[in-house]
Amino acid sequence: MNYDIYHSSITYFPLLPLSKTASFECKVLDIRQMPAQVLFPHWDDEFEFIYVLSGMMEFRVRQKAFLVSSGEGFFLNTGEIHSACAYQSYDCRFVIYRICPSVLFQTEDNPLYQKYIKPMVDHPSFGFLTFVPKVPWQKYILEMIRKMNDICERPVDGYELKINHFINEIFYYIFHNVNLSKELSLKESRDLERMKDVMIYLTKTIDQKHTLADIASYCHLSNSECCRLFQRNVHLSPAVSYTHLTLPTICSV
């Protein structure tokens, strides 16, 4: 997985929650077929696994941008802002799994959830993981995601039980390999919360006309610091963000 950062225009959108009857959701997407060739910045109440089936794209999370290729993937914790966009002339097909925490344990007061899962998902620095085949435990996780793909492509009665099995197995390996020693700085934590807040605000007030000064005032920041907040977290200016938000193209993932 090559690492790179650069700027391009991307947008965000409100994501619908999973159905109350669904414990997970699987969708295959083509970055070239999406509006503006972009997976719009958003976050979810569910865990996400992203696996690249073919090609290459740019994936953005936590002020970083990655060039992710076929056979590589990501894990995203709940509430993590992320996005993706086409890279140069490359096509890219990828699969997204949205996983409800109830797949692991029905209730959060389950002792095993409290012991193994809660410390990870609640840790401020644990936002995402990259998966590359050259790292043995990550390669094993990627193989399990491929098996999940095969099962979802040809589902039979009981296939959800197999998916649940693989998800639990994946979290076992994440638990044994994730490093929770790093602490998120106060500035990073404040940035993330402020970014979510302003994204919700702009979405709810989409029918109103906003200026940089309006957005900065809502964030309780100067104009220049507001611009830096947007560039750090979604790699675009507030003006470009608002302009793209008002476009009539909405992508439903």
Stretches with model-predicted labels:
Residues M1-G73, G79-E80, Q88, Q114-K115, ...:
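Generic protein-terminus/edge-of-domain signal
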Residues G71, E225-F230:
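Short hydrophobic/aromatic patch on the recognition helix
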Residues G79-S102, L112:
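Ligand-binding loop in jelly-roll beta-barrel domains
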Residues S102-H123:
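Double-stranded beta-helix
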Residues G127-Q138, C152-Q208, L212-C219, R232-S237:
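Short, Lys/Arg-enriched, Trp-marked, Pro/Gly-tolerant hinge/linker segments that flank
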Residues S222:
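Helix-turn-helix DNA-binding motif, specifically the short coil turn and the N-cap/start of the second
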Residues H244-V253:
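Single conserved hydrophobic/aromatic residue that forms the stacking wall/gate
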